[in-house]
Amino acid sequence: MSNNDETVLGHLADHVFKHSGPIPESFVEVKGIDYSKPDAIDMRASDLIKSMKTMGFQASSLGQACDIIDEMRAWRGKHIDELDEYSRKGSFDENGFQKSTIFLGYTSNLISSGLRETLRYLVQHNMVSAIVTTAGGVEEDIIKCLAPTYLGEFTLKGAALRDKGMNRIGNLLVPNNNYCKFEEWIVPILDAMLAEQEAYVAQQGKDCLGVNTDVDSPIWTPSKLCDRLGKEINDESSVLYWAHKNKIPVFCPAITDGSIGDMLFLHTFRASPQQLRLDLVADIRKINSMSMEASQAGMIILGGGLIKHHIANACLMRNGADYAVYINTGQEFDGSDAGARPDEAVSWGKIKVEAKSVKVYADVTTVFPLIVAATFANGKKN
């Protein structure tokens, strides 16, 4: 070997075989699941997620999401007897200790999908404090009590489906007759709500329309409408039914953006000159007040857009959430709210600097059933 060759090899060794520095003790070794071991057979969901935490990529984020949810559920503060009157707000467990107020947000397509049953489980068992969804998240829950949604294909042609009166949501199909049944069901309820509103106004005077401090008054808000629909449907398969039964508010700031908006629009003609009113401002006061009164606040956001921002902005009123789990497929390069990572919300004061937060980049229907199985439904009581 010539001196020149030795020089070249020396340079290459410096570049290619550069020595690593000391490995920090905090580093975790990447490991997967060894299915040849007996304890990997018929694993519990919680054990599966625990094993996935060291896989890397979104598997690790999934494990982190479960840890954060477990922590927000397990947190306990002072007993109510230790608090002054002003501090006796927020959420408390059955023993009277402060617990996290958990805001659950989900987009309408998730109710259209089979994830509805998972979401209903959380509400049925009082595992969340408040819900934010879109109009479809309200109406599709009711519609599924009236008629089924079917599996289809992503590739089905829109023109052919239109001829058959079939509406496609991804690879789901909703017959248009379902919406006709929804109209038949909801119109008498809207009529009754309008009659109650007008009777109240006649009794109290028109000035009562500007005041909405009485929770039981028929000056309607989107959350009161959702509660009424849950009461009227009286079906245990419904998310709204259990929200009504357990007094969990369902906020829908975009209540008119869907079939229910169509029903409200048509009702303005049927009921004219009387008009059913929905007070959005009363609802923003209600959700923001819930956030401000929370001892600890957690966000579980399934999807993006309005439902994500509405909860995050409510948490701004308390200088940020203490826990945040985002699950969606959005990317941040387009500046969208859906794509934004939790750290962007930190810059706005919507998540605390010291908060536990993670974003899982995944289809919610793929990973959230696993998360619920490993946390809310793992048999451990929080």
Swiss-Prot record:
This is Deoxyhypusine synthase. The keyword NAD applies. Spermidine binds at E139, E140, D262, H309, G335, S336, D337, E344, A345, V346, S347, W348, G349, K350. Catalyzes the NAD-dependent oxidative cleavage of spermidine and the subsequent transfer of the butylamine moiety of spermidine to the epsilon-amino group of a specific lysine residue of the eIF-5A precursor protein to form the intermediate deoxyhypusine residue. It catalyses: [eIF5A protein]-L-lysine + spermidine = [eIF5A protein]-deoxyhypusine + propane-1,3-diamine. Its EC number is 2.5.1.46. GO terms for biological process: spermidine metabolic process. GO terms for molecular function: deoxyhypusine synthase activity. Keywords: Hypusine biosynthesis, NAD, Transferase. GO terms for cellular component: cytoplasm. InterPro entries: Deoxyhypusine_synthase, Deoxyhypusine_synthase_sf, DHS-like_NAD/FAD-binding_dom. It comes from Eremothecium gossypii (strain ATCC 10895 / CBS 109.51 / FGSC 9923 / NRRL Y-1056). It holds the Pfam family DS.
